Amino acid sequence: MDSSACKKSHQSKKWRIQAQENFAKKFPYRLSWLTEPDPEPLQPWEVTNDSNTVQLPLQKRLVPTRSIPVRGLGAPDFTSPSGSCPAPLPAPSPPPLCNLWELKLLSRRFPRQLAFLLSTRHTEAACPQTSKAAGLSRGLS
């Protein structure tokens, strides 16, 4: 039994090496673990002509930009009241509920939030100054 097990492992190893070699021949990239190092160094790629920049005039005019804009160059100027941390942004107002089906779906999905929104809208309509003050006090705490 030992000889048959050894024979099977040798065959599977031989088959695996053959499969790797076939894969390396068909695969378009060089795999370091399947190729032997060449004594000659790799040659750099030749630079092609810049015909693409001539064909695409829009790309010639593109300028690299910063991900964080420079203050004064398109960035909105704002001053923070404390100086070290930016001012908190006001809470976005919810979109107006125009359709009855939207109101119904939202009330089923978010029953507490919708009741809160409807109550705040009702107080805003009745007394706008007190609701704004209440919103500011809620935002600070």
UniProtKB/Swiss-Prot annotation:
A single GO cellular-component term on record = cytoplasm
Could you tell me the keywords of this UniProt record? Answer: Cytoplasm
Taxonomically, which superkingdom?
Eukaryota
**Compartment(s) of residence:** Cytoplasm
Cytoplasm among keywords = yes
Protein name according to UniProt: Uncharacterized protein C3orf22
